Amino acid sequence: MAFCFSALLPTLYPTDAETLFTTLAAHDVPYALLEGTRDVWLRDFMPVRTGSGKLVSFRYEPCYLKNDPVLRTDFRKDLAPQLGLPVTYSNINLDGGNVVFSPSGAHVLISDRVFSENPEYPSAALVHELSELLE
């Protein structure tokens, strides 16, 4: 499996990208550049891999990009067609960068911002659905 980076990385951060890619190549670490992203932070909008290996894609409409929608990548529309991954989709608004699994994968930490960004969900229902999705 290759590490994936946004194809924007070499354009926006050429020196850092060159250092990173040279280092990866020197250690025979495969990597790929992903076309169609609108920002370099793939972790925020790509699917989250659960402890069992299932991929879950959340709606990515973070409050911090409310006034800058050009930076918001819609995984389902912009990237999923070219990747063909088996993904479970959720309408929960969640920045994947706010999802951190414990080393065992048995527990997950999520920023409490998930509650303010999903006002249509009662808190208990949101926690329950996240527990089901993230196993």
Place the predicted regions along the sequence by residue.
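The feature marks the mature, well-folded catalytic cores of soluble enzymes
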Residues: 1-135
